[in-house]
Design a protein with these regions (language model features):
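An acidic/histidine-cluster motif and surrounding catalytic segment
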Residues: 2-90, 94-241
């Protein structure tokens, strides 16, 4: 019924409650689901950091942020090595909005008609509170070009093979020197990939809503409440623009 892309889940093995959550979340999905398990924080080595990061950069240390970045880069390699058309990449705290796969399929129909010949990353999440202004939205359209100076995080995105190849090639030649979401936008600015936003967004990281504690930095309960209030404000603000 739906576009049967592979789903790759970015997962840290010690977070067993998140694995159980993702299995329940995706239990009705009939396509292939695989987990990116390598490069947990306690598995990082100096050699591994040197393979992916520029020496001395902000992520060149044995941290949760470095682990997360490497897992996303390994997802790119997975797409390339398995010769996939692309994959939907989800972090293990993601909350999918109502009728996610139905709406995802509609966005993919538009992707196939307009963008499949390009190296494409499609962001599906709203965790960064970045939206398409209402004045720019077109009825029946799901995908919009991302501004060059905005970051939508990496909780839920589709990456086609051409974009995965471009990212993996750049890592091999130039190394990553910033957090993975900013690295993706850096490659977008350089013209190596193109980033699209799905509007309306279809997913939110549970680390922001309070469902989970963040695996990178602690988000306290009051911060989750503040995020939800800010979310309502931002949705209204972008609707008025």
């Amino acid at each position: 019924m739906y576009f049967m892309t592979t789903i790759l889940v970015i997962h840290a093995k010690p977070l067993t409650e998140r694995k159980a959550y993702m299995e329940e979340l995706l239990k009705d999905f009939t396509g292939k689901v695989d987990y990116i398990l390598d490069a947990d924080r306690d598995e990082l080595t100096d050699e591994m950091l040197a393979e992916f990061f520029k020496p001395g950069c902000e992520v060149d240390k044995k941290s949760n942020a470095a682990s997360c970045a490497i897992k996303h880069l390994l997802a790119c390699r997975y797409i390339v090595e398995h010769d996939l058309e692309g994959a939907l990449i989800l972090e293990d705290d993601i909350e999918l909005h109502d009728r996610f796969f139905e709406k995802f399929e509609r966005s993919m129909q538009e992707y196939r008609q307009r963008y499949s010949h390009l190296p494409i990353l499609i962001s599906y999440e709203d965790s960064s509170l970045q939206f398409v202004p209402r004045s720019q939205r077109v009825k029946g359209q799901w995908l919009y070009e991302s501004p060059l100076n905005r970051v939508r995080f990496t909780g839920a995105y589709y990456l086609n093979r051409a974009a995965a190849e471009a990212i993996w090639k750049d890592v091999q030649e130039n190394k990553c020197d910033i957090s993975v979401d900013h690295y993706q936008v850096k490659l977008y600015r350089e013209g190596k990939i193109q980033i699209l936003w799905c509007e309306p967004p279809l997913a939110t990281q549970g680390s922001f809503t309070g469902r989970f504690s963040s695996s990178i930095g602690r988000i306290r309960k009051f911060e989750a409440i503040r995020w939800k209030l800010k979310y309502a404000y931002k949705r209204l603000l972008y609707w008025l623009r």
